[in-house]
């Protein structure tokens, strides 16, 4: 039997996941993080993107996170997300439209602030599309 730890993924709206997992993958402020059982204690910001959850027995779940905080303690990991949406609940058409609008905004941006905001929106749309794609593959 694989080693596991307890994971809680919570957004401002609801608890998205609570259970035993073998590992997770998430994008922290310093890059990609893989959290396995026995990981050293850690507190870090999460960038917009996805969390890949490998549950007990190897089943995978993908959740889009708009950002938040990751806390790793012995035996338990907590993700406090600004917004969290399960892959199957994301709307592909809306994500594609958001991506298109962000790309247009980047092309027509005037100034660093406009460009930075449009780039952030583009990154969020691309992350949502990636979560949708991986969720479809996992089903």
From Swiss-Prot:
What is its membrane topology? Peripheral membrane protein
Return the InterPro entries for the record. ATP_F1_dsu/esu_C_sf, ATP_synth_F1_dsu/esu, ATP_synth_F1_dsu/esu_N, ATP_synth_F1_esu_C, ATPsynth_dsu/esu_N
For this UniProt entry, which segments traverse the membrane? none
Q: Which domain of life is it from?
A: Bacteria
| Gene Ontology molecular function, alphabetical | ATP binding; proton-transporting ATP synthase activity, rotational mechanism
Q: Which Pfam families match?
A: ATP-synt_DE (PF00401), ATP-synt_DE_N (PF02823)
Subcellular localization is given as: Cell inner membrane
Keyword rRNA-binding (UniProt): no
Annotated keywords: ATP synthesis, Cell inner membrane, Cell membrane, CF(1), Hydrogen ion transport, Ion transport, Membrane, Transport
Q: Explain the purpose of this protein.
A: Produces ATP from ADP in the presence of a proton gradient across the membrane.
Assembly and partners? F-type ATPases have 2 components, CF(1) - the catalytic core - and CF(0) - the membrane proton channel. CF(1) has five subunits: alpha(3), beta(3), gamma(1), delta(1), epsilon(1). CF(0) has three main subunits: a, b and c.
Family the UniProt entry places it in: Belongs to the ATPase epsilon chain family.
Q: Which HAMAP family match?
A: ATP_synth_epsil_bac (MF_00530)
Name of the protein this chain belongs to = ATP synthase epsilon chain
């Amino acid at each position: 039997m694989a080693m596991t730890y307890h994971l809680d993924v919570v957004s401002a709206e609801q608890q998205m996941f609570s259970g035993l997992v073998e590992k997770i993958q998430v994008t922290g402020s310093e890059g990609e993080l893989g959290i396995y059982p026995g990981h050293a204690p850690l507190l870090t910001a999460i960038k917009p993107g996805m969390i890949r959850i490998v549950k007990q027995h190897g089943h995978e779940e993908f959740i889009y996170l708009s950002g938040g905080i990751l806390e790793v303690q012995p035996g338990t990991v907590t993700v406090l997300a600004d917004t969290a949406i399960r892959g199957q609940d994301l709307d592909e058409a809306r994500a594609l439209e958001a991506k298109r609008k962000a790309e247009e905004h980047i092309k027509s941006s005037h100034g660093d602030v406009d460009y930075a905001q449009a780039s952030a929106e583009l990154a969020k749309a691309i992350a949502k599309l990636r979560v949708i794609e991986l969720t479809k593959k996992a089903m």
